[in-house]
Amino acid sequence: MSEAVLRFTGSGLSFDTRTLWRDLDLDVAPGEFIAVLGPNGSGKTTLLRSVLGQVALTEGDVTANGRIGYIPQQHADDSDTMMLRGRDLVGFGADGGSWGMGLRGLRSRRTRVDAALAEVDATRYANTAVGLLSGGEQQRLRIAQALTRDPSILLCDEPLASLDLTSQQVVVDLLDARRRRARTAVLFVTHELNPVLPFVDRVLYLADGRFRIGTVDEVMNSAALSDLYGSPIEVVRIGGRLVVVGGEDSHHCVEHGYADEAAS
C-alpha cells in the first residue's frame, strides 16, 4: 500500500470552549479525492489551514508527505490580482516568496509557469489581465498556480463558488485529470457535493464538533447524517443527484447546497 501523502493522527482543534473536531485519524492516499463537507462554521477551511501550518492543532498531528498545492477561495473584492497578467498570477506559485533569483532560476520559473498554463489549457490567457477574464478562466489560472510546484496533494477551498455549471465542470475535470495522471491527492472543500459526486472516493463530513468519514454511501445517508446532527435528516437520490433535507437550522437544501461560511 502506498504511503499516505497526508496524515491526521489524533488531531483536534478547539477555540476557547468550542470544538471544531477531535480525535480525527485520516490517511489520504496518492490520487485519492476526498470531499470535505459541513455546515457554516464547522471548520472546513480551518482544516485546510491546519495542513498549511496557518492554524495550530490543539490535539494530535498533521503530516504532509510531499509538496502541497493550494487553491484558495475566490473573492469578488480581490482587486490586488485583477491587474496582473495571467502569467504573473501563476508565477506566484513558482516563486514561493523567494527573492533574488538568478538567470537559471528565472528560466526554470518560466518553464514551470508555461507547463502549468498548458496543463490547464490556459496558455491563451497568459498575457491577459486577470480582471478581464471570466470566473472560470480565472479559476484555471489559480489551478495552474497550484500546479507549478508539481504537488503531491491539492488543497481546494471552495473552488466552484460563484462559477456557472459549465465552468464548474471544467474545474472538476481539470482536477480529476491531474490526479489520474500524476496521482495527486485532492482535498476538496465544497458547498455542493453533486458536481464532484462521480469523482469522490471518500467524504469527510464535519458538524457540531463531530465528523464522519467514509464513502459517499456510508456518509451521505439519512441515518448517518441524522446521527451526526442529532436531528432528522433525509437523504434522497434523484436522477443521480443527492438531495439532502432537514435540520432546524436549515443547514441543508435541495441538491446538497449549503449557505456556508466564507472562512469556515
Summary of predicted features, one role per range:
Residues 91, 106-125:
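Conserved ABC ATPase "signature" region
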Residues 129-133, 137:
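Conserved ABC ATPase signature
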Residues 150:
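Conserved catalytic motifs of ABC-family nucleotide-binding domains
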Residues 154-158:
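Catalytic Walker B motif of ABC-type/P-loop ATPase nucleotide-binding domains
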Residues 190-191:
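H-loop/switch region of ABC-family ATPase nucleotide-binding domains
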Residues 202-216:
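H-loop (His-switch) and adjacent beta-strand-loop-beta switch element
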Residues 221-223, 227-264:
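ABC ATPase nucleotide-binding domains
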